[in-house]
From Swiss-Prot:
Tetrapolymerization of the monopyrrole PBG into the hydroxymethylbilane pre-uroporphyrinogen in several discrete steps. Coiled coil: none annotated. The modification S-(dipyrrolylmethanemethyl)cysteine is found at residue 240. The gene is hemC. This is Porphobilinogen deaminase. Its EC number is 2.5.1.61. One of its GO terms (cellular component) is cytoplasm. InterPro entries: HemC, Porphobilin_deaminase_cofac_BS, Porphobilin_deaminase_N, Porphobilinogen_deaminase_C, Porphobilinogen_deaminase_C_sf. Belongs to the HMBS family. Keywords: Porphyrin biosynthesis, Transferase.
Length: 309
């Protein structure tokens, strides 16, 4: 195989991610020609509606997957937090890259952190997961929907439309963006989204030539952790329309630790728990933890959220 086409979204961050994979491929295979195919997804077109109200899964991947299925592209680069639980039957994940910082970042031009924000401060985010955890910490905060690419969000902050905004740390680091006050929120305060910080390479199952190309990029520990998180999410049948968080780490030798959270969007109820299992049980730990949270009351929260939506 001498040439490969990578499908990607067109945002600056998505383009950075696709170019990163392109560079890794060309370092490993100097003979390989790599082209990028930019595709606009439904999620890119709808910028005036919070994600929780758009509905549907795969908002940022469906059109890209169609390019894979038609053969227009050989592979696709995704942020793993955007990848739906169920992939089309013909597609699979060829690799999950080593995870970047999975946390969320607080950014402000006046205030050093969440606790220093004034009463009733305006905080920008369209993530119900972030909203719920912020309000659990500071019920007085006014959460304002904030969509658009990273540059747009940062520009709105610098124009003082918000007292602070919350974004994924990985994206900020990858693009080298700065604000007067920036601080990563610890997982004890803001548990990350499932898959946050990792990149996934999606390909057709039958394309053995493409699968083999990406084997060197698969990071074993990250792969196990992301699979456990996604299994947890699948057990809850959740998506970006529900305040769910899940984060797994290899906490000891051959031991995987998974922490999960389901919350009411107003932060008034937070159900959180964790499990440890041997890495060999990574595919079992997610479903087990989801059942524990459902038994602890997450089922009522999820039912009420689906009724609202």
């Amino acid at each position: 195989m001498k040439k490969i086409t990578i499908a990607t979204r067109g945002s600056k961050l998505a383009f950075w991610q696709a170019n990163y994979i392109k560079d890794q491929l060309q370092k490993m295979y100097s003979y390989l020609e790599v082209d990028l195919m930019v595709i606009k997804t439904k999620g890119d077109h709808i910028l005036d509606v919070p994600l929780a109200k758009v509905g549907g899964k795969g908002l940022f991947v469906k059109e890209i997957e169609e390019a894979l299925l038609s053969g227009e592209a050989d592979c696709a680069v995704h942020s793993m937090k955007d990848v739906p639980m169920e992939l089309p039957f013909e597609l699979c994940l060829a690799a999950i890259t080593e995870r970047e910082d999975p946390t969320d970042m607080f950014l402000s031009i006046k205030y050093s952190g969440v606790k220093s924000l004034p009463e009733n401060a305006l905080v920008g985010t369209s993530s119900l997961r972030r909203q719920a955890q912020l309000l659990a910490l500071r019920p007085d905060l006014q959460i304002i929907p904030l969509r658009g690419n990273i540059d747009t969000r940062l520009r709105k902050l610098m124009a003082e439309e918000f007292d602070a905004i919350i974004m994924a740390t990985a994206g900020i680091k990858r693009l080298g963006l700065i604000a007067p006050y920036m601080s990563s929120l610890p997982c004890s305060v803001m548990l990350p989204a499932v898959g946050q910080g990792a990149l996934g390479i999606e390909v057709q199952k039958e394309r053995q030539d493409v699968l083999e190309l990406f084997s060197f990029l698969n990071h074993k520990e990250t792969y196990h952790c992301i699979q456990a998180e996604r299994d947890f999410l699948a057990g809850l049948d959740g998506g970006c329309q529900v305040p769910i968080a899940g984060y797994a780490t290899i906490c000891k030798q051959e031991t995987i630790c998974l922490e999960g959270l389901v919350a009411k969007s107003d932060g008034s109820v937070m159900i959180r728990n964790r499990l440890e299992r041997s890495v060999s049980d990574a595919y079992d730990i997610g479903m087990t933890l989801s059942k524990i949270l459902l038994a602890e009351g997450a089922d009522d929260i999820l039912a009420s959220m689906h009724t609202i939506l």
